[in-house]
Amino acid sequence: MQYQKLILFLNWRIGIVLKKLNYRFKNMDLFKRALTHSSKSENNYERLEFLGDSILDFLVGEYFYLNCNDDEGKLTILRSHYVSENYLVKVFDALCLQDDVILGKSYQGEISKAIKGDVVEAILGAIYLDGGLDKARKFIYDNFDLKNYKNIIDDNYKSKLQELIQGNFKGKIAYETVPCEGNQGGFEANFYMDE
């Protein structure tokens, strides 16, 4: 009787996750692998994450190529934002997957940002293998707020400075980062230019 309750609970839980993903897997092994951390099994999400990472880069790049008239530099900034670990964590959290990742007993504590990002990429890789590129594209369009790209702020100040200098001066650029005393994690950035 306990075993039947466990099976019912697991099937219910799987149904909830699939509903969140808005995708029905034909191959449930891919789905399970996409959620399985290496601390639990050798049959884990690492290879799916590798594939999903490439597909994510491609499909986000494709979206901006087709929908944004900005130059290559701006397109690169936009793509970098949406494929970043920080953005993948937002997608993971929005999908409420924290209780669905399968971890081994050796894993302690909260799920790290890196694992959250890896799981999103692994799910994308699994959807691609199971349903093809159009289904992977739909997953991205449903879960990544690509249409609001105009709200993305470019806060890569080092790149901005480099573009400004290279556009107006000729010379080599060098950077130096010096830790600040007494300020844990703080630093001073120095910029040098050879005229």
Spans of model-derived segments:
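Double-stranded RNA-binding/processing signature
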Residues: M1-E195
